UniProtKB/Swiss-Prot annotation:
Pathway: Carbohydrate metabolism; pentose and glucuronate interconversion. This is Mannonate dehydratase. Keywords: Iron, Lyase, Manganese. It holds the Pfam family UxuA. NCBIfam families: PRK03906.1, uxuA. Belongs to the mannonate dehydratase family. It is an enzyme of class 4 (lyase). The keyword Lyase applies. GO terms for molecular function: ferrous iron binding; manganese ion binding; mannonate dehydratase activity. The lineage of its organism: Bacteria, Bacillati, Bacillota, Clostridia, Moorellales. Its cofactor is Fe(2+); Mn(2+). GO terms for biological process: D-glucuronate catabolic process. Its EC number is 4.2.1.8.
Length: 359
């Protein structure tokens, strides 16, 4: 298991690499290029600069999150082939600089969705939160405005302004796209992408829908064991893999996260793990919590044990954290709570390994 930490890059993150380097275990960096429009080729010089910046700080960069998929690909429009060719070239460029895993998602229009970016928890910390009634009743344009107003001046991943300017047009286009068609469009994309991924030795890792159910009537196809099996079957290759996000899939209590890790891990399809906890209050209503098992609804010991049991060699990172100790930054991506998360997850990993030796 290789522990990592997401960093949004100079000018896009309130956290500096020298602070990340001080986290026990010195995690690897997960990052991306944020000033290239979705669908365009990532230039080699930008990738090189990012790689050198990370390495000059004494850290490693082997995982990219994310190379976003253009909406025309998800919609299956004739223009998708140009964007797919650009995606292929981006993979080739990334491979030249030692990138091993690319995380991506296939969620229509919106990436992760929350009703509150700074809900005050009983301990005084703030966290991302989801209330089904609020989300389904709010106008999508209003939600975009609220996200922009409450992001502390940062552009949030999956909520890039250039993608959301055409919201009305996108919703109209998606009226003719159901889950079956979206899955078909994903298959078209994967059949073009995976051969290139195999050629350049980059593992593709699809991220689950967050949350794992439909919002605003949009289709969702990455939400359960059954849906993940369908996606793996689209292209039967170890390079067609998964980012197993415990918080995303775990928002639905029907998803047994340790069982999913063992099932898809045994098939060699998990390349990246997002390990975080959530507190489920009722069906489709949850807050994000600290990583500690007792603070949420997921058993983090069992999750890490499942990874240990499959002898996981891929990458893991703590996911969204609370904002604690007065920190102000990108919602969900502060330093302190995620650093605590790394210490906790590393502690579980060490303890599990030593317990096995004793037993």
């Amino acid at each position: 298991m290789k522990m990592t930490f997401r960093w949004f890059g100079e000018g896009y993150d309130s956290i500096s690499l020298d602070k990340i380097r001080q986290i026990p275990g010195k995690p690897g960096i997960v990052s991306a290029i944020y000033d290239v429009p979705v669908g365009e080729v990532w230039p080699e010089e930008k990738i090189k600069k990012l790689k050198e910046t990370v390495e000059n700080a004494g850290l490693e960069l082997e995982v990219i999150e994310s190379v976003n998929v253009h909406e025309d690909i998800k919609l299956g429009l004739p223009s998708r082939d140009r964007y797919i060719e650009n995606y292929q070239q981006t993979l080739r460029n990334l491979a030249k600089f030692g990138i091993k895993v690319v995380c991506y998602n296939f969620m229509p229009i919106f990436d992760w969705t929350r009703s509150d970016l700074a809900k005050v928890l009983p301990d005084g910390s703030t966290a991302l939160s989801y209330e089904e009634e609020k989300v389904q009743k709010v106008d999508p344009n209003r939600m975009v405005e609220e996200v922009e107003a409450n992001s502390n001046g940062f552009e949030l991943p999956g909520w890039e302004p250039e993608r959301l300017k055409t919201l009305k047009v996108l919703f109209e286009q998606y009226k003719s796209v159901d889950e079956e068609k979206l899955l078909k469009n994903l298959g078209y994309f994967l059949r073009a992408i995976i051969p290139v991924a195999e050629e350049v030795d980059i593992k593709m890792a699809i991220h689950p829908d967050d949350p794992p159910w439909s919002i605003f009537g949009l289709p969702r196809i990455v939400k359960s064991k059954e849906s993940l099996e369908k996606i793996m079957a689209l292209v039967d290759s170890p390079y067609n893999g998964i980012t197993l996000c415990s918080g995303s899939l775990g928002a639905n209590p029907d998803n047994d996260i340790p069982a999913l890790i063992r099932y898809f891990g045994a098939k060699g399809r998990i390349h990246f793990g997002h390990v975080r906890n959530i507190k489920i209050h009722s069906l489709r209503n949850f807050d994000e919590s600290s990583h500690l098992s007792s603070d949420g609804s997921l058993d983090m010991f069992e999750i890490m044990k499942a990874y240990h049991d499959i002898d996981f060699k891929g990458y893991i990172r703590p996911d969204h954290g609370r904002m604690i100790w007065g920190e102000v930054g990108r919602p969900g991506y502060g330093l302190y709570d995620r650093a605590l998360g790394i210490a906790y997850l590393n502690g579980l990993w060490e303890a599990i390994g030593k317990m096995k030796k004793v037993c």
